[in-house]
């Protein structure tokens, strides 16, 4: 099943990957990403744990209707969440680089 040293190499790779994943999780938790909507009139910043850190609303929107402002805030939150997910996937791809993972295997994020 495993060639000469195959199991040992597999265990070594698994431990290295676990260490890299731990380091990556710590880095991702520190990330902050800003999502925007309305051409930058609404900005929402979230961290790697998807917690909202900041909401910025252009003063010109305070005069417009409430429904539009609510829609722009929701769109900015969704944009920020999408951006943090993309960043996490990119970082995790670098961790698993070289590992032969089964098709469809998902990292723990």
From Swiss-Prot:
It comes from the Bacteria. It is found in: Cytoplasm, Nucleoid. InterPro entries: YbaB-like_sf, YbaB/EbfC. The lineage of its organism: Bacteria, Pseudomonadati, Pseudomonadota, Gammaproteobacteria, Enterobacterales. This is Nucleoid-associated protein Spro_1136. It comes from Serratia proteamaculans (strain 568). Keywords: Cytoplasm, DNA-binding. Binds to DNA and alters its conformation. May be involved in regulation of gene expression, nucleoid organization and DNA protection. GO terms for cellular component: bacterial nucleoid; cytosol. The keyword DNA-binding applies. Homodimer. It holds the Pfam family YbaB_DNA_bd.
